[in-house]
From Swiss-Prot:
PROSITE patterns per record: RRM
Gene3D superfamilies: 3.30.70.330
Gene Ontology BP terms: mRNA cis splicing, via spliceosome
InterPro entries registered for this protein in UniProt: Nucleotide-bd_a/b_plait_sf, RBD_domain_sf, RRM_dom, SRSF
Cross-referenced PANTHER family: SERINE/ARGININE RICH SPLICING FACTOR (PTHR23147)
Subcellular location, record wording: Nucleus
Gene Ontology MF, one: RNA binding
Taxonomic superkingdom: Eukaryota
GO cellular component, one term: nuclear speck
Organism: Schizosaccharomyces pombe (strain 972 / ATCC 24843)
Protein name in UniProt: Putative splicing factor C222.18
UniProt keyword 4Fe-4S present: no
Amino acid sequence: MSNAPSNTPTGFNYKPGHTLYIRNFGTDMRARTLGQAFEKWGRIVRCDIPISSNPQAHRYAFVEFEEREKAELAHEKMRNAKIGNDIIFVEWAKSRERYHRDDKRRLSNYA
């Protein structure tokens, strides 16, 4: 069992600094297609597109690189890249702790 922190509440484990969070792609995007678009920057350990129980939810993905430097390069090069008909957004994946901390900040703005 890995000691790596869980990502967002989906429960994916990953190495911090090695994993990118991808969003803004259509329902026809497949993990294999997304992974192939990123693998030119380095070896990919995993590419996941979680399945939501809510069909209206926006799709997102996690792309994990073997080497941190390759993830940094992909983060720089793939921001606002076009894959098929989609212009994707690329951010660093957050740990579960950071996700919840940021979520609490958002909720506190409404108090």
